[in-house]
Curated annotation (Swiss-Prot):
Positions marked as site (Reactive bond): R15, A16
Organism taxonomic ancestry: Eukaryota, Metazoa, Ecdysozoa, Arthropoda, Hexapoda
Domain of life: Eukaryota
Species this protein is from: Galleria mellonella
PANTHER family cross-referenced by the UniProt entry: BPTI_KUNITZ INHIBITOR DOMAIN-CONTAINING PROTEIN (PTHR10083:SF374), KUNITZ-TYPE PROTEASE INHIBITOR-RELATED (PTHR10083)
SUPFAM superfamilies: BPTI-like
Protein name (Swiss-Prot/TrEMBL): Inducible serine protease inhibitor 2
Domain BPTI/Kunitz inhibitor: 5-52
Job of this protein: Inhibits trypsin and the toxin protease PR2 of M.anisopliae. Does not inhibit chymotrypsin, subtilisin Carlsberg, proteinase K, porcine pancreatic elastase and the toxin protease PR1 of M.anisopliae.
GO CC annotation, single: extracellular space
Induction comment from the UniProt entry of this chain: By infection.
Keywords: Disulfide bond, Protease inhibitor, Serine protease inhibitor
Length: 52
């Protein structure tokens, strides 16, 4: 498992509603979440295929 995938899913503090994907360590799979548009970590992908 890539270390960046163990980072928490961060929605960010801004108010955009962008659909992104990140690895959820509890579910052990990539899931979709709403990203606010700023302040994120590396566990934030535009496409599901890139998250895997």
């Amino acid at each position: 498992l890539d270390p960046k995938c163990t980072l928490p899913l961060e929605t960010g503090i801004c108010r955009a509603e962008l659909h992104r994907f990140g690895y959820d360590t509890k579910l052990k799979e990539c899931t979709q979440f709403v990203y606010g548009g700023c302040h994120h970590n590396e566990n934030n992908f535009k496409k599901l295929e890139v998250c895997r």
